[in-house]
């Protein structure tokens, strides 16, 4: 049965998708709590492996302690099974020395090795061409070997140290900003509460002064009214007393006038009567 062009195209698309999916290594969590990316299917030289890690925002792994080495060995056992050729992040900066004790450095950090897990008689810099470090598949204990950096093999990546340091510093800075903002917010709330209390106190004092002022004004008005009333009463009493005195004087004057008139009339009547009697005697 012949394949049609459509079938061929479908097969090619499936193959591309399958290959792309299979080629993406997955992060695996180790006993130390860190996540590592292990590539065993596709092969790269050391520099290509470095760039592959960078594409995933990672770096070739650095192993600074026995604990970290044991965690990675345990992870490789669980994920891969047996020992594999896997690039690590170390190299000797292309030293020409074949001395086993020549210095090696972790390229992601620039730090010299403080821990190593070399296989027997290594690092030997065979033919002066072995400058990059890897886990060796010929050693069941997952020991290290120096090899030509152009040899292709798998690799192990870990989170970028500088990115982690930057993220940690950024996180600490953000936390510090949050603490500062929280402190400022707390201080503002406390100041606002204090000002509110002071404003309430001032408002209450103003209200009290206003109330006291009203009371004093009322007292003054009452006192003024009482004083005016007293003055009016005293004035009325003086007028009444004066009127009564004038009336009494008038009555006394009338009485005196009456008495004087009566006396004058009586005296005049006596004189007139005597004169009449005299006239009668004469005439």
UniProtKB/Swiss-Prot annotation:
Alphabetized InterPro entries for the sequence: C-type_lectin-like, C-type_lectin-like/link_sf, C-type_lectin/snaclec_domain, C-type_lectin_CS, CTDL_fold
Keyword Mitochondrion: no
GO terms for MF: carbohydrate binding
PANTHER family according to UniProt: MANNOSE, PHOSPHOLIPASE, LECTIN RECEPTOR RELATED
SUPFAM superfamilies in UniProt: C-type lectin-like
KW Disulfide bond (keyword) present: yes
Species of provenance: Sarcophaga peregrina
Pfam family, one: Lectin_C
Swiss-Prot/TrEMBL keywords: Disulfide bond, Lectin, Signal
Extent of the signal sequence: 1-23
Highest rank taxon of the organism: Eukaryota
Function, as annotated: Role in the defense system of the organism against microorganisms. This lectin binds galactose.
Disulfide bonds: 53-157, 132-149
SMART domains (UniProt xref): CLECT (SM00034)
Inducing stimuli: By injury of the body wall.
Domain C-type lectin: 51-159
Protein name, UniProt field: Lectin subunit alpha
